[in-house]
């Protein structure tokens, strides 16, 4: 039976002594990570072509306080692994100068450390972290949903001033009954997605309210003196508002993707290059060297809408859930002209503009809703690709 990784996040309130120990662990994790970043930054093609990165033992020998730290040794090893992942991500994007590993800071909103050698038992209603760190009380409403025998790691995290215990399990996937539906999905800016059934789905209004709250908190932050106590408090309020937006969007996408997987055996969706679609509009200059209006403002608005919708994360959720539950998920090439083709007769309307939400086919005279027609074409092309690949 296939296995998947699932996590459960449990909020808890540590005692003053335990909170102090956890803060020491966060500090030890930051120190270990920053040692790797410092070594990475010391690279020099001539003077230091192969810098030696310190291991856990090296850091403990050189720093006596680290030997006495309550942080588990596996957490320090995981910190080094986290740095290597960040380093690999940087090298993948090196040509763009992005994702360079940066120093971890005590002022970062999220502090965490991960232990991959967990205890797999409970002491009553408490889960033991380690001998030095003590245990965490699990409230009845947060009871652990999966067997502890399948626990692979735990992470203690402090986010927006709240402590969380995040448990990661390897659990068997329960097979779902075969569904009969087939659906094509067209992603959009005006509507989050349009289905080939004609249904259009948008984020709930609550998301707009949360985004307004972010803007409100940011305006308050702009009026604070940088570095002051009020500035730090307001910065935490901004981070909390952002986290609410992120969690709401993630929850909505999980519920929607689960419903689509539950109802359909075959799902077709277009493949979009979000990074290319959200590039800045190039500036144009007139004869005097002054910038001319070329739709940059409209492009910025569209970029924000595209990034806000989170198309890539939604596609990833559909892909792995389809794999879990035996569904077929096919993505159509981004250059496929799904909006321009008539679903009924195949006529191609080459002059279709972005502002045209409906158009009449010159081949058969049918009135098309732009997005519904695109979703139908995506479903047809995905079925064709699936049959060709068999």
Language model segments and positions:
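Generic detection of short hydrophobic beta-strand segments and adjacent strand-loop junctions
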Residues: 8-12, 136-142, 146, 201-203
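Positively charged, helix-rich recognition surfaces that bind polyanionic ligands
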Residues: 6, 16, 20, 31, ...
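Gly/serine-rich nucleotide phosphate-binding loop at the start of the catalytic core
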Residues: 1-77
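Long, hydrophobic, amphipathic alpha-helical segments used as structural scaffolds
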Residues: 37, 41-44, 87, 91-98, ...
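Acidic carboxylate diad motif detector
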Residues: 53-159, 298, 304, 308
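Stable alpha-helical structural segments in soluble proteins, enriched in small hydrophobic residues
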Residues: 36, 79-90, 372-382
């Amino acid at each position: 039976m296939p296995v998947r990784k699932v996590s459960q996040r449990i909020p808890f309130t540590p005692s003053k002594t335990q909170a102090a120990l956890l803060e020491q662990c966060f500090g030890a994790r930051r120190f270990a990570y920053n040692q790797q970043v410092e070594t990475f930054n010391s690279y020099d093609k001539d003077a230091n072509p192969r810098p030696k990165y310190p291991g856990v033992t090296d850091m403990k020998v050189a720093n006596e306080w680290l030997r006495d730290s309550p942080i588990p040794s596996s957490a320090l090893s995981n910190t080094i692994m986290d740095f290597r992942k960040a380093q690999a991500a940087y090298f993948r994007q090196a040509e763009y100068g992005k994702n360079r590993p940066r120093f971890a800071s005590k002022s970062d909103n999220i502090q965490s450390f991960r232990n991959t050698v967990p205890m797999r038992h409970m002491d009553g209603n408490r889960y033991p972290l380690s001998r030095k760190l003590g245990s965490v009380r699990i409230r009845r409403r947060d009871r652990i949903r999966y067997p502890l025998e399948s626990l692979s790691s735990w992470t203690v995290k402090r986010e927006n001033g709240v402590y969380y215990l995040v448990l990661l399990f390897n659990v068997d996937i329960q097979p779902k009954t075969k569904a009969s539906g087939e659906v094509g999905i067209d992603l959009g800016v005006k509507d989050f997605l349009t289905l080939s059934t004609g249904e259009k789905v948008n984020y709930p209004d609550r998301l707009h309210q949360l985004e307004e709250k972010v803007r409100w908190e940011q305006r308050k932050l702009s009026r604070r003196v940088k570095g002051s106590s009020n500035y730090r408090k307001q910065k935490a309020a901004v981070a909390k508002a952002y986290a609410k937006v992120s969690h709401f969007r993630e929850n909505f996408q999980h519920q929607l993707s689960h419903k689509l997987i539950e109802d359909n055996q075959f799902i077709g969706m277009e493949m979009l290059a979000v990074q290319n679609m959200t590039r800045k509009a190039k500036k144009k200059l007139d004869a005097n060297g002054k910038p001319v209006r070329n739709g940059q403002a409209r492009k910025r608005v569209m970029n924000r809408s595209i990034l806000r919708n989170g198309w890539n994360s939604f596609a990833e959720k559909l892909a792995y859930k389809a794999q879990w539950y035996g569904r077929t998920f096919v993505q159509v090439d981004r250059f496929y002209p799904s909006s321009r083709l008539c679903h009924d007769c195949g006529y191609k309307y080459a002059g279709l503009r972005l502002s045209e939400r409906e158009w009449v086919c010159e081949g058969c005279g049918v009135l098309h809703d732009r997005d519904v027609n695109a979703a139908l074409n995506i479903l047809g092309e995905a079925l064709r690709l699936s049959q060709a690949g068999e």
